[in-house]
């Protein structure tokens, strides 16, 4: 870890490997995440895993390496654990990339093929063992919707905060044992990479995430609210039909010429979280005026998948969900979705903004 003020390598997109570390070495503010999530075909079970290289929690005495594991069951019970590895290895080979986060008592790994079509996550800990495998139903993408490789695309989604999606949407197979209980199912999966020059608390006021698998359609949306640009929205969406990209946009302003989309939170459903934002679902509209194409998707939460509380009613709630939709005037499809709604507090006793324009 660099403690000097000298510049470090910091990836900004282009042809950089999506899976490789995005900063070398770590410094005092920049952090990154490899994130995997999934929802079962009955929309009742879910998981989310996070692999981190991030100094922003070192003040808690836990170091710069972290792995988080969360699962949800149909009866509303949830399991969560966080481990702090002593070692981290990223191996880049011709076949793909392997990541290892380990200590004497546990081991977490992921493997992503070079074409980013397949992924496998494995873990061996005192409480959790098993494997999650994914087969992509989409294509790796940048925030601007272009698919990898794209030399002129940037990974910067908003000021000082970056994302790419190696696997926007996938079919997932889960075969795990948690506290001696089998946790095995098939469903929706996905993977994204998130990194920033500063902490999430510095860069973001909020975030909305949607991942959909319905019939031939695979959809991924991330929308960020900037803290540095005080409330400005930075949305990004991509839709795939039988694995081929058919729509992408960062524009939410209605137009007679340019492709655009809208996402609206709904509050008339039955399943919500414990935070101030009682969202129960989403409505999505994707419009391509030039091609005279229009898709709609209606999402209704089925179960609370995970939740983290940041104080004063803020934090993040993730849900497994049902979805119904497709192209207007054509066959409509039922499927499954994962959503997340995140709001950061305006102030925190633990974290201070790391960015200043002065």
Curated annotation (Swiss-Prot):
Q: What class of enzyme is it?
A: isomerase
Q: Could you tell me the keywords of this UniProt record?
A: Isomerase, Virulence
GO function term, MF aspect, one: isomerase activity
- Pathway membership, UniProt: Mycotoxin biosynthesis
Record-listed E.C. numbers: 5.5.1.-
Record's family?
A: Belongs to the Diels-Alderase family.
Describe the task this protein carries out.
Diels-Alderase; part of the gene cluster that mediates the biosynthesis of the mycotoxins phomacins, leucine-derived cytochalasans with potent actin polymerization-inhibitory activities and monocot-specific antigerminative activities. The first step in the pathway is catalyzed by the hybrid PKS-NRPS phmA, assisted by the enoyl reductase phmE, that are responsible for fusion of the leucine precursor and the polyketide backbone to produce a 2-pyrrolidone intermediate.
Q: What is this protein called?
A: Diels-Alderase phmD
Name of the encoding gene: phmD
């Amino acid at each position: 870890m660099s403690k000097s003020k000298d510049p470090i390598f910091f990836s900004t997109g282009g042809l950089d490997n999506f899976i490789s570390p995005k900063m070398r070495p770590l410094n005092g503010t920049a952090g990154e995440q490899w994130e995997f999530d999934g929802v079962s075909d009955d929309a009742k079970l879910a998981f989310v895993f996070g692999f981190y290289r991030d100094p922003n929690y070192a003040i808690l005495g836990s170091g710069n390496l972290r792995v988080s594991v969360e699962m949800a069951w149909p009866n509303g019970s949830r399991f969560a654990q966080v481990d702090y590895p002593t070692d981290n290895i990223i191996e880049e080979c011709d076949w793909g990339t392997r990541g290892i986060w380990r200590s004497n008592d546990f081991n977490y790994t992921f493997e992503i093929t070079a074409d980013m079509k397949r992924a496998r996550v494995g873990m061996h800990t005192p409480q959790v063992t098993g494997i999650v495998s994914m087969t992509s139903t989409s294509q790796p993408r940048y925030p601007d919707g272009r698919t990898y490789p794209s030399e002129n695309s940037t990974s910067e989604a908003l000021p000082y905060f970056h994302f790419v999606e190696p696997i926007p949407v996938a079919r997932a197979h889960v075969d795990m044992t948690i506290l001696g209980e089998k946790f095995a199912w098939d469903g929706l999966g996905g993977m994204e990479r998130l990194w920033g020059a500063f902490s999430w608390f510095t860069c973001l006021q909020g975030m909305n995430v949607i991942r959909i698998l319905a019939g031939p359609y695979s959809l991924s949306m991330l929308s960020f609210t900037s803290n540095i640009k005080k409330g400005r929205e930075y949305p990004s969406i991509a839709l795939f039909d039988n694995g081929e990209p058919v729509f992408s946009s960062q524009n939410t302003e209605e137009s007679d010429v340019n492709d655009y989309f809208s996402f609206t939170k709904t509050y008339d459903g039955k399943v919500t979280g414990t935070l101030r934002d009682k969202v129960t679902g989403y409505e999505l509209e994707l419009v391509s005026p030039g091609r005279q194409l229009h898709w709609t998707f209606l999402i209704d939460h089925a179960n609370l998948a995970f939740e983290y509380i940041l104080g004063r009613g803020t934090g993040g709630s993730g849900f497994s969900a049902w979805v119904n939709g497709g192209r207007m005037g054509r066959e409509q499809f039922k499927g499954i979705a994962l959503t997340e709604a995140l709001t950061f507090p305006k102030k925190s006793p633990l974290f201070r903004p790391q960015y200043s324009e002065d």
